[in-house]
């Protein structure tokens, strides 16, 4: 169960719970792979908790350009399958 940061604070930074879950998972994977940490101090010891703390701090956001690229790639995949 998430105590810190609160889900309400996180949803101020991300438009939906689904987007929050995906963003946190991707960032946690980056942290586990050795990516640089964006905060100097974390309350959580786990990578998902650290990712959520970075999201709450506003240091990790959803890149609108990457969302557009993903949509374009999905459209191309659909056309290729037809």
Swiss-Prot record:
Pfam families for this protein: RNA_pol_Rpb6
The keyword Electron transport appears for this protein: no
SMART domains: RNA_pol_Rpb6
GO biological process, one term: DNA-templated transcription
UniProt keyword terms in alphabetical order: DNA-directed RNA polymerase, Nucleotidyltransferase, Transcription, Transferase
EC number of the protein: 2.7.7.6
InterPro entries xrefs: DNA-dir_RNA_pol_omega, Pol_omega/Rpo6/RPB6, RPB6/omega-like_sf
Substrates-to-products reaction catalysed: RNA(n) + a ribonucleoside 5'-triphosphate = RNA(n+1) + diphosphate
Taxonomy, superkingdom: Bacteria
A GO cellular component entry from the record: DNA-directed RNA polymerase complex
Main enzyme class: transferase
Record keyword Transcription regulation present: no
Family under the similarity heading: Belongs to the RNA polymerase subunit omega family.
The protein's assembly and partners: The RNAP catalytic core consists of 2 alpha, 1 beta, 1 beta' and 1 omega subunit. When a sigma factor is associated with the core the holoenzyme is formed, which can initiate transcription.
Role summary: Promotes RNA polymerase assembly. Latches the N- and C-terminal regions of the beta' subunit thereby facilitating its interaction with the beta and alpha subunits.
HAMAP family: RNApol_bact_RpoZ
Protein name as it appears in the record: DNA-directed RNA polymerase subunit omega
Lineage: Bacteria, Bacillati, Bacillota, Bacilli, Lactobacillales
Gene: rpoZ
